[in-house]
């Protein structure tokens, strides 16, 4: 894959872009394909720009971790100065498009999505505190709320409640991955939760958060969703998440934690698709 595409973290940002799209479709009722295309472009550029900036800012951390040592900057595929200019150009273009094409309120949320990931998470919190992902997770709220604001012209309580499905899922997902690579994080000096507390406590916290996230998603669909096809999708995600989380709590093994990570990964996507079916 082209290293400049890798800088965008496509395997990470696609879910945030999907949340923007779903927010719009869920709120709008009738889809304006031109506005949806503009939203997708602005979200992709802004979120992709923040991901590229994360690559630039964390290039020393990436070089110290076996999992990330082959990324474009530590591998020498792209000069850091190029990555910085690239990230800022994408970010600025995405944010400006958000305000110009989408309007003030959606534009604010596009900018906030960038800010929480690039500044709050990457610059302020990542190296300082295990609370890093709890601060940066608001980027997930912002992406959904931006799409919702575009579709409805405002942000209401249902929108905020639904956006917290993304916020709750992010730390449980990231911490489950960090548990597998906890030695990498310790070596790099990054205070991710599984790297700084007892492993048994980490398993308990991550598993409990996964179960809580699944329960919250199910409640959201029962309140705001409609239709059996969507309910079937949500129940499939909830069942896989709860079952593997309970197994991880009981076994407290690396294998069980990885199984939980893999099984719980699709639940947010399934929930977002269920909202579209509603």
Swiss-Prot record:
<dbReference type="InterPro" id="IPR030470">
    <property type="entry name" value="UbiA_prenylTrfase_CS"/>
</dbReference>
<keyword id="KW-1003">Cell membrane</keyword>
<comment type="function">
    <text>Converts heme B (protoheme IX) to heme O by substitution of the vinyl group on carbon 2 of heme B porphyrin ring with a hydroxyethyl farnesyl side group.</text>
</comment>
<dbReference type="GO" id="GO:0048034">
    <property type="term" value="P:heme O biosynthetic process"/>
</dbReference>
<dbReference type="GO" id="GO:0008495">
    <property type="term" value="F:protoheme IX farnesyltransferase activity"/>
</dbReference>
<protein>
    <recommendedName>
        <fullName>Protoheme IX farnesyltransferase</fullName>
        <ecNumber>2.5.1.141</ecNumber>
    </recommendedName>
</protein>
<feature type="transmembrane region" description="Helical">
    <location>
        <begin position="157"/>
        <end position="177"/>
    </location>
</feature>
<feature type="transmembrane region" description="Helical">
    <location>
        <begin position="130"/>
        <end position="150"/>
    </location>
</feature>
<keyword id="KW-0350">Heme biosynthesis</keyword>
<feature type="transmembrane region" description="Helical">
    <location>
        <begin position="105"/>
        <end position="124"/>
    </location>
</feature>
<feature type="transmembrane region" description="Helical">
    <location>
        <begin position="12"/>
        <end position="32"/>
    </location>
</feature>
<feature type="transmembrane region" description="Helical">
    <location>
        <begin position="72"/>
        <end position="92"/>
    </location>
</feature>
<feature type="transmembrane region" description="Helical">
    <location>
        <begin position="228"/>
        <end position="248"/>
    </location>
</feature>
<dbReference type="InterPro" id="IPR000537">
    <property type="entry name" value="UbiA_prenyltransferase"/>
</dbReference>
<dbReference type="InterPro" id="IPR006369">
    <property type="entry name" value="Protohaem_IX_farnesylTrfase"/>
</dbReference>
<feature type="transmembrane region" description="Helical">
    <location>
        <begin position="36"/>
        <end position="56"/>
    </location>
</feature>
<dbReference type="InterPro" id="IPR044878">
    <property type="entry name" value="UbiA_sf"/>
</dbReference>
<feature type="transmembrane region" description="Helical">
    <location>
        <begin position="257"/>
        <end position="277"/>
    </location>
</feature>
<feature type="transmembrane region" description="Helical">
    <location>
        <begin position="204"/>
        <end position="224"/>
    </location>
</feature>
<comment type="pathway">
    <text>Porphyrin-containing compound metabolism; heme O biosynthesis; heme O from protoheme: step 1/1.</text>
</comment>
<comment type="similarity">
    <text>Belongs to the UbiA prenyltransferase family. Protoheme IX farnesyltransferase subfamily.</text>
</comment>
<keyword id="KW-0812">Transmembrane</keyword>
<keyword id="KW-0472">Membrane</keyword>
<dbReference type="GO" id="GO:0005886">
    <property type="term" value="C:plasma membrane"/>
</dbReference>
<dbReference type="Pfam" id="PF01040">
    <property type="entry name" value="UbiA"/>
</dbReference>
<keyword id="KW-0808">Transferase</keyword>
<keyword id="KW-1133">Transmembrane helix</keyword>
């Amino acid at each position: 894959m082209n290293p400049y595409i890798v800088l965008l973290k496509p395997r990470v940002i696609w879910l945030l872009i999907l949340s923007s799209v779903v927010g719009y479709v869920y709120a709008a009722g009738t889809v304006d394909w031109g506005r949806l295309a503009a939203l997708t472009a602005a979200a992709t550029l802004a979120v992709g720009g923040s991901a590229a900036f994360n690559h630039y800012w964390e290039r020393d951390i990436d070089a110290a971790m076996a999992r990330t040592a082959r990324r474009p900057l530590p591998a020498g595929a792209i000069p850091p100065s190029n990555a910085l200019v690239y990230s800022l150009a994408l970010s600025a273009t995405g944010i400006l498009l958000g305000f110009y094409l989408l309007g003030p309120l959606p534009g604010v949320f596009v900018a906030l999505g960038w800010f929480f990931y690039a500044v709050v998470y990457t610059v302020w919190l990542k190296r300082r505190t295990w609370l890093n992902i709890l601060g940066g997770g608001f980027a997930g709220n912002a992406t959904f709320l931006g799409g919702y604001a575009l579709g409805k012209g405002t942000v209401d309580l249902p929108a905020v409640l639904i956006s917290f499905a993304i916020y709750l899922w992010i730390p449980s997902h990231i911490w489950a991955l960090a548990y597998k690579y906890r030695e990498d994080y310790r070596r790099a000096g990054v205070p991710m939760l599984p790297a700084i507390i007892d492993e048994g406590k980490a398993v308990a916290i991550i598993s409990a958060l996964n179960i809580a996230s699944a329960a919250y998603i199910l409640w959201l669909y029962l309140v705001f969703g409609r239709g059996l096809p969507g309910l079937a999708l949500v129940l499939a995600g909830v069942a896989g998440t709860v079952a593997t989380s309970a197994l991880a709590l009981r076994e407290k093994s690396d294998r069980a934690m990885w199984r939980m990570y893999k099984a719980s990964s699709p639940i947010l996507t399934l929930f977002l698709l269920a909202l579209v079916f509603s």
